[in-house]
Amino acid sequence: MPFHLAPYLAKSVPGVGVLGALVGGAAALAKNVRLLKEKRITNTEAAIDTGKETVGAGLATALSAVAATAVGGGLVVSLGTALVAGVAAKYAWDRGVDLVEKELNRGKAANGASDEDILRDELA
């Protein structure tokens, strides 16, 4: 008896998120393989970017499924809701990751800046 992955994952929000992560991760990996071949990024950079994109795509997909289900409506309303929620979730994820990376690169302890100072600088 064959196992049907997509219908199995579509039964729950976490499953939908996993499916989104698989698709988003595959797209990120394809992009990073090309960049690796062109020697524009290192293996470490490719792995980190692929991981970030995989998680972000999974979260965005899961949130878009929740939003579309909560709003209901017809096909157009559901698709529009899913699109807006997915874009918003991915944007928030990317922005959060950028803030964390900047803080790590800056070396918060080395410059003695408080969390409030760092946040104020990033939001300015």
Swiss-Prot record:
<dbReference type="GO" id="GO:0110146">
    <property type="term" value="C:magnetosome membrane"/>
</dbReference>
<keyword id="KW-0408">Iron</keyword>
<feature type="region of interest" description="MIC, when fused with the C-terminus of maltose-binding protein (MBP) or expressed as a fragment, improves quality of iron particles during precipitation experiments, binds magnetite">
    <location>
        <begin position="36"/>
        <end position="56"/>
    </location>
</feature>
<keyword id="KW-0091">Biomineralization</keyword>
<keyword id="KW-0479">Metal-binding</keyword>
<comment type="subunit">
    <text>Probably interacts with MamA.</text>
</comment>
<comment type="function">
    <text>Probably involved in magnetite crystal growth. The lumenal domain may bind the magnetite crystals, affecting crystal size and shape.</text>
</comment>
<feature type="topological domain" description="Lumenal">
    <location>
        <begin position="30"/>
        <end position="64"/>
    </location>
</feature>
<protein>
    <recommendedName>
        <fullName>Magnetosome protein MamC</fullName>
    </recommendedName>
</protein>
<feature type="transmembrane region" description="Helical">
    <location>
        <begin position="65"/>
        <end position="85"/>
    </location>
</feature>
<comment type="similarity">
    <text>Belongs to the magnetosome MamC family.</text>
</comment>
<feature type="topological domain" description="Cytoplasmic">
    <location>
        <begin position="2"/>
        <end position="8"/>
    </location>
</feature>
<keyword id="KW-1133">Transmembrane helix</keyword>
<keyword id="KW-0812">Transmembrane</keyword>
<feature type="topological domain" description="Cytoplasmic">
    <location>
        <begin position="86"/>
        <end position="124"/>
    </location>
</feature>
<keyword id="KW-1281">Magnetosome</keyword>
<keyword id="KW-0472">Membrane</keyword>
<feature type="transmembrane region" description="Helical">
    <location>
        <begin position="9"/>
        <end position="29"/>
    </location>
</feature>
<dbReference type="GO" id="GO:0046872">
    <property type="term" value="F:metal ion binding"/>
</dbReference>
